[in-house]
Amino acid sequence: MVLDELISEFDRGLRSLTGISRMSRPVPVPTEPTVGELTPAERAHAAGLMRVNHVGEVCAQALYQAQKLTARSASSKAMFEEAAREEEDHLAWTAHRLKELDSRPSLLNPLWYAGALAIGVAAGTLGDKVSLGFMAETERQVESHLDGHLSELPATDTASRAIVEQMRVDEVKHGKAATDAGGIELPLPARMLMRAASKVMTRTAYYL
């Protein structure tokens, strides 16, 4: 059983890094038709933002894989699995949008993935309440990050905006579920360290 689980997660990791993630839900579509074309500068900026979002989803896969494997209770394992499945949709959606924008994922995805996997293992070994608290705080920070992207994306880029808006809905749900399941609030130094690490990742991934 443990071996089967490890093989399954290894397969998911490979799919995360090779861009062949499975999509269980279709790519969100704009509620209103796109008006006008993106300028080259707008297209480049949108691509940078969506590359950052794609990196975030690569990291989410690694985090939730590690937290699922180290979780003590069956209910916690199930929660991390459900979140990972929905985040895999996000991974596929952002990859799809990057192709539409004639861009590419981050060249450093293996590094981001490995780092997030290590962090997920560390959080998981501290117990389910801490691990769920880490999940809740991660989702809160991602929610804030997506709000920022919605304010930055060109108004005419309705395709990217539709994807980010649905991602935000899912992240809020994941964070609430983790808190409701008993996730504790992380100490301020831990939250600040998470924000600092996130800034390094987002600033680098925008270009690389």
Swiss-Prot record:
Pathway(s) this gene product operates in, as recorded in its UniProt entry: Cofactor biosynthesis; ubiquinone biosynthesis
UniProt binding sites for Fe cation 1: 57, 87, 90, 171
Membrane topology: Peripheral membrane protein
Cofactor binding, note field: Binds 2 iron ions per subunit.
Pfam families documented for this protein: COQ7 (PF03232)
Superkingdom to which the source organism belongs: Bacteria
UniProt GO molecular function: 3-demethoxyubiquinol 3-hydroxylase activity; metal ion binding
Record's keyword terms, sorted: Cell membrane, Iron, Membrane, Metal-binding, Monooxygenase, Oxidoreductase, Ubiquinone biosynthesis
InterPro entries, per the entry: COQ7_proteobact, Ferritin-like, Ferritin-like_SF, Ubq_synth_Coq7
GO biological process: ubiquinone biosynthetic process
GO CC entries: plasma membrane
Main location: membrane
Localization per record: Cell membrane
Keyword Disulfide bond on entry: no
EC number: 1.14.99.60
Residues holding Fe cation 2: 87, 139, 171, 174
CC cofactor: Fe cation
Catalytic activity, reaction form: a 5-methoxy-2-methyl-3-(all-trans-polyprenyl)benzene-1,4-diol + AH2 + O2 = a 3-demethylubiquinol + A + H2O
Biological role stated in the UniProt entry: Catalyzes the hydroxylation of 2-nonaprenyl-3-methyl-6-methoxy-1,4-benzoquinol during ubiquinone biosynthesis.
Family, as annotated: Belongs to the COQ7 family.
NCBIfam families registered for this protein in UniProt: DMQ_monoox_COQ7 (NF033656)
UniProt-listed PANTHER family: 5-DEMETHOXYUBIQUINONE HYDROXYLASE, MITOCHONDRIAL (PTHR11237:SF4), COENZYME Q10 BIOSYNTHESIS PROTEIN 7 (PTHR11237)
HAMAP family in UniProt: COQ7
Name of the protein in question: 3-demethoxyubiquinol 3-hydroxylase
